[in-house]
Amino acid sequence: MQLSSYHDVIKAAERLEGFANRTPVFTSRTLDAETGAQVFIKCENLQRTGSFKFRGAFNALSRFDEAQRKAGVVAFSSGNHAQGIALAARLLQMPATIVMPTDAPAAKVAATREYGATVVFYDRITEDREQIGRTLAEQHGMTLIPSYDHPDVLAGQGTAAKELLEFTGPLDALFVGLGGGGMLSGTALATRALSPDCLLYGVEPEAGNDGQRSFQTGSIVHIDTPATIADGAQTQHLGNHTFPIIRENVNDILTVSDAELVESMRFFMQRMKMVVEPTGCLGLAALRNLKQQFRGQRVGIIVTGGNVDIEKYASLLKG
């Protein structure tokens, strides 16, 4: 298996031009004072569909041939990849079917349907979404695009870090949320090309530390679906495409608690007036845990998404 390279990220950026938002990079005096660092926040919560996932989805679908476009695409997702695929399919004028868990946030399900996709539900505790997706693909001749373990998907995700580093110049450290590894592996390709000395950290919820364990042992660790408010990181294992890139290019994998995610959600709302979903807060929570470790340095965070039900959001912030 040939691993993806930074060249693939560059080509993905060319395909995304005119379709994906070049999301803003914000700063916060409050956060700089708290950490002692100069912190740059890449806001993928302001991406189309409210998440970085649109980047990888559009890049993958844009490479379909005419027969694939006619047959359509099938994907399985807890929400953000679903919306990314649904919108990309609409823009490229192809049918899309999305396999989503029964407990997926209602806002994500509604948005997926509004983009024109057909939604098929599964029970994430008792059913295998990958098998359901493969079966649908075989039955209807559709192409299956996984949410992270695909070279075109991870290359597309890497364009967010490419934009960040082209804006900031070299960074001393960069914090990125970790679920299946699409964003982290794509970010690693861009970071090693544009800021080779940058310390790159993946961040997982404590309950879903399969990535950390995989990184420590050198082989992919499988776990049960983790119980965490970070629904975008409720993955059971890293991917065959993502893990080798992570193993070779990431400095460490950190974990944070759900309580720390809520505190970071509160920070984004109170200090930066931004709605960020729990998974999108992984990077900030990890940086804040490290206190003043990066005093005097330039640090980046990628906020991966802002799709969260209003009721759940209010409930979490109330505590």
From Swiss-Prot:
EC number(s): the record gives 4.3.1.16
Q: Where does pyridoxal 5'-phosphate bind?
A: 80, 179-183, 304
> Which example biological process does GO assign this protein?
modified amino acid catabolic process
Q: What induces it?
A: By D,L-threo-3-hydroxyaspartate.
Q: Which residues carry this modification: N6-(pyridoxal phosphate)lysine?
A: 53
Keywords assigned by UniProt, alphabetized = Lyase, Magnesium, Manganese, Pyridoxal phosphate
- Keyword Manganese listed? The answer is yes
Q: Which Pfam families match?
A: PALP
Q: What activity regulation does UniProt give?
A: Is strongly inhibited by hydroxylamine and EDTA in vitro.
Query: What is the annotated role of this protein in its UniProt record?
Result: Catalyzes the deamination of L-threo-3-hydroxyaspartate to oxaloacetate and ammonia. Shows a high specificity towards L-threo-3-hydroxyaspartate as other 3-hydroxyaminoacids, i.e. D,L-erythro- and D-threo-3-hydroxyaspartate, D-threonine, L-threonine, D,L-allothreonine, D,L-threo-3-phenylserine, D-serine, and L-serine, are not substrates for this enzyme. Exhibits no detectable serine and aspartate racemase activity. Might play a role in the detoxification of naturally occurring 3-hydroxyaspartate in Pseudomonas sp. T62 cells.
This chain's protein is named L-threo-3-hydroxyaspartate ammonia-lyase
Q: What organism is this sequence from?
A: Pseudomonas sp
The major lineage groups are: Bacteria, Pseudomonadati, Pseudomonadota, Gammaproteobacteria, Pseudomonadales
Q: Which gene encodes it?
A: thadh
